[in-house]
């Protein structure tokens, strides 16, 4: 949604009439349809997980003055107060899937809802998505992010609603510690490491005794009510060997990381799985 796409999302967010909002959504659907086609084509027959819009409001609206934008109107919250946003993204994804099928492709799609903290947020959003995918050309799996401490604590309420869940460990670490990553990385964490208060940055290596405990308890409670649920993590921890070892032993099915870290993530995951 940045670059050339930024004016479209701004038009939607600042629309003062349904007509203007609908015009913006039509533009959004057209743009995202092609974006999704470009993603699905090289990943043909492989699962592609699309996380619905999650960025904080200030990344789109420079005049937005939220006191704490990372905890403000973003993710599922933005979708719930502007209902048609996630519907539009879902329509674009279905359109892209149809185009791939017409080109003899085999799109395998998963849709993930971000920043859930309340069961009702997920229930409402999934209902909207299911209404949009009723005529989808193939099956679409639905999932949720677990990136707030409350979501981890009520994972057994969320797990029956979805096919998969993914821990967003960057945000989960921020909210568990009460750290603003952008603010404390240099000013606090480096000093804490020098003072031996911290051994490693919790944003570089997963905090097993705190954040990790939330992850482990959420996995256990989720599998108790939905044994077949697929569980993974996304974030910088997905490329850290120590974090990967902990996560594999905690029961995750996969880790997601930035491209340069994929080789080490694969190696460590395989080694740990064979033990």
Regions found by a protein language model. Give the residues of each.
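Conserved alpha/beta-domain cores
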Residues: 1-275
